[in-house]
Design a protein with these regions (language model features):
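Gly/Pro-enriched, hydrophobic low-complexity segments
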Residues: 456-461, 522-611
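Short beta-strands and strand-coil junctions in structured, solvent-facing domains, enriched
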Residues: 62, 66-67, 147-148, 160, ...
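M16 family metallopeptidases and their MPP-like homologs
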Residues: 1-10, 17-62, 74-82, 88-114, ...
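Flexible, processing/modification-adjacent segments and terminal tails
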Residues: 115, 398-412, 469-534, 542-544, ...
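Buried hydrophobic packing residues in well-ordered domains
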Residues: 4-6, 26, 40, 52-56, ...
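N-terminal mature ectodomain segment of secretory-pathway/periplasmic proteins
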Residues: 405-479, 506-512
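An aromatic/glycine/proline-enriched structural segment found at the starts
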Residues: 138-203, 364-394
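Non-catalytic, conformational "gating/processing" segments within enzyme and secreted inhibitor domains
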Residues: 94, 121-157, 357-358
Length: 612
């Protein structure tokens, strides 16, 4: 993971310039300079090119690796990692990389909190000093400049950059699966499954089959006209889109093929079946000429447009040198695209598109999909980091338990009905961090059902939710919106001092659905149908009675989404009550949020005026 930090560290100042001074010079030049772990990109007006190259040369010869900057990057990485813990897309990316390449291959490495903690400034320095050397670098300059001018500027500004022997690393060669194999990463309650049919591919850049396979891949899943999109979305409406991609690579089996879809949970197995069917069809049937010509025309058009971008021209020039490609590869690109025949497409499909030899990865609700996936191959459950999860079944349901008694047990565990009924008002303050900024969330409730939520940052209110028991509104950034009928019912429920006491009131229906695992512990799953018709799944720890998780789905412009909330570390609070010290929430518009309890005040005499 430390290689991902190199670019940020290098552009955080030099030994003679602070980060602000460095960025100010770039701004004054109107220039761009971005650095990754494998290269540098720069852009400026011609008159400023010498000054920009001087800045880049300074970065390469006298970088200032800052511990403060590294600490900030590690903190940001951990924050992003926390969001990934409940993100099916991230789950899919991780497990796909690990299965295709293995954990000991650089392409199969997955960042974890443990790996972030191991990153040191010394390791970052050593990587830079070892691999950032001119004798293994290529430079392409595109613009209104001749060779003599370019050579003079490069020699002037990079002359102090020292050559050094660079070690050549070797890696274990990835192996395609022996047949079809299914890998599932569980996302309990997910209403969609992220599907990927994938495997490593052995093809170097510039190989004779590369252009032919690009045509084949485009016909299969290169966009909205691709067969996957037309099948899964237009014909069956299982997904918003389905696509395929192919990537060549200089390492043996370092390339990959991938056919993806974000399918409704109920259609997960059907989506996989149709993806495999379309892959096989390309191997066994000649592509109609109009479809073939249509995609070849598209490739020709995008290639021509790409030539207008100087960055693309630079990349092409470097590719031919770096990968030892034919010198006329790009010169003859359009001619070679046009020469691809339907027979060529079928032949490369038979060679490289292998539905029977693939990893079928699915990030979704294993309870809903695992059994159905067995028809495609052996099923293995993995965690986010690619470790095999032992699928231990939950305990059997006791015969003398009911949904009502489970909810009552939670009330008793958190203080009891009598203690909760003595609460006339309560102010709960929680804090969280988002993108390095501290945010406070203050929630004030007053019996019977008044509520005020104030989200603020550095003393400035970002959003308010106000409900006076009958009506309410939401305000923020100078805008105010009154609640509609559905919102009024929603916040009337949320204004209850204890959610569980509201569940036992008339109008709510409780249904015990079984026992599920929550963080390896057994929990009763109770489906609650509120008086307003909304449904929420609540999970209560079998041993302690505490609520440990909630799931609620809602329709959004992007489709149905599930918001999951975890309640952790119940501790004694005021009034003889117990409260979770940490609440984690995912699936909302802001990704994963971790809120920590700062304070709770009870019966302080809250005025009705604040709810107006």
């Amino acid at each position: 993971g430390f290689q991902d930090f190199i670019g940020e560290l290098l552009t955080a100042g030099t030994k003679s310039k602070t980060k602000d001074e460095f960025n100010q010079e770039l701004d004054m030049l109107g220039a761009t300079l971005s650095i990754g772990n494998d290269g540098i990109y720069m852009q400026s007006l011609k008159k400023n090119s010498d000054k920009l190259l001087a800045l880049c040369g300074e970065v390469l010869t006298s970088p200032n690796f800052s511990q403060e900057e590294l600490d900030k990057l590690k903190k940001q990485a951990k924050s992003s990692l926390a969001n990934n813990l409940d993100d099916p897309e991230a789950m899919s990316r991780n497990i796909t990389s690990i299965l295709n390449y293995g954990k000991k291959h650089p392409y199969g490495e997955v960042m974890s909190e443990k790996s972030i903690d191991k990153i040191t400034l010394e390791r970052c320095k050593k990587f830079f000093e070892t691999y950032f050397r001119p004798n293994v670098a290529y430079m392409a300059i595109v613009g209104d400049i001749n060779l003599a001018e370019a050579k003079a500027q490069v020699e002037k500004n990079f002359g102090k950059w020292e050559k050094k022997v660079v070690p050549v690393s070797t890696y274990p060669t990835p192996k395609p699966p022996a047949g079809a194999a299914v890998g599932i990463v569980n996302k309990t309650g997910a209403v969609q499954s992220v599907i990927d049919v994938t495997y490593p591919v052995n093809m170097k850049q510039g190989s004779p089959d590369e252009i032919k396979l690009k045509v084949a891949n485009g016909i299969l899943g290169g966009g909205s006209t691709g067969r996957l999109f037309q099948n899964l979305r237009e014909t069956h409406a299982w997904t918003y889109g389905s696509y395929s991609s192919f990537r060549s690579d200089e390492l043996p089996y370092g390339g990959s093929f991938s056919a993806t879809a974000n399918s409704t949970t109920s259609a997960s197995d059907s989506s996989v079946a149709e993806i495999l069917k379309e892959m096989n069809k390309l191997r066994t049937e000649l592509v109609p000429n109009d479809q073939l010509q249509g995609y070849k025309n598209y490739m020709a058009g995008t290639f021509a447009l790409g030539l207008e971008d100087p960055r693309t021209l630079a990349r092409y020039a470097i590719n031919e040198k770096k990968y030892n490609m034919p010198k006329d590869y790009y010169k003859n690109y359009l001619k070679n695209v046009e020469a691809v025949t339907a027979q060529d497409v079928m032949e490369v499909a038979k060679k490289y598109i292998t539905p029977g030899v693939a990893y079928i990865t699915v990030a979704g609700d294993k309870k809903m999909i695992a059994e159905k996936m067995k028809k495609f191959g052996p099923v293995t459950i993995y965690d986010l980091n690619g470790n095999i999860v032992k699928d231990t079944p939950p305990a059997a349901m006791p015969s003398n338990i009911s949904a009502t008694s489970i909810v009552q047990k939670h009330i008793d565990a958190t203080g009891g009905t009598a203690a909760w009924q003595k609460v006339n008002d309560m102010i709960m303050v929680m804090n969280m961090e988002m993108q390095g900024m501290k945010i406070n969330i203050s929630t004030t409730r007053k019996a019977p059902n008044k509520m005020l939520v104030d989200v603020n940052m550095m003393g400035n209110s970002l959003q308010k939710i106000v409900f006076d028991g009958n009506k309410g509104y939401m305000s923020g950034q100078g805008q105010k919106k009154d609640f509609d009928e559905l919102e009024t019912k929603k916040y009337a429920d949320e204004a209850n001092m204890s959610e569980e006491l509201g569940y036992l009131a008339p109008g709510c229906k409780l249904s015990l659905k079984g026992i599920e695992k929550v963080d390896d512990a057994d929990a009763y799953m109770v489906e609650v149908t509120k008086a307003n018709g909304e449904k929420v799944s609540e999970y209560y720890d079998v041993k302690t009675g505490f609520k440990v998780k909630s799931e609620e789905s809602e329709d959004t412009p992007e489709g149905k989404q599930t918001q999951t909330t975890y309640y952790l570390d119940y501790q004694d609070g005021k009034g003889g009550l117990k409260f979770p010290q940490i609440i984690k929430q995912s699936g909302g518009p802001m990704g994963l949020m971790e809120m920590k309890l700062q304070s709770i005040d009870i019966n302080t005499g809250v005025s009705d005026e604040i709810f107006k």
